[in-house]
Amino acid sequence: MYIRNGKGLWGDVAYSVDGQYLRYGKGLWGDVAYTVDGQYVRYGKGLWGDVAYTLDGEYIRRGKGLWGDVAYTLDGEHIRHGKGLWGSIVYTLD
């Protein structure tokens, strides 16, 4: 599954997941957030001080992939930083 770096319909920076947008915006308390169908993916701290995004209480953790690449893990799955077929930066979720 690809999370693509792109633009939303109104010019905002967005990441699309299977055609759905993760929109860059502000949360209710001024924190930076990405919205998925109106839900917030919040920027915060993990249990051990690492940077994490929370989605419905689950953590997307910043870490290292199996081959040393920066990855975000969601329930043990990796979101990998890479290149798309057309040269766009993408994150893949195994």
Predicted regions and their residues:
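Intrinsically disordered, low-complexity proline/glycine-rich segments
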Residues: 1-94
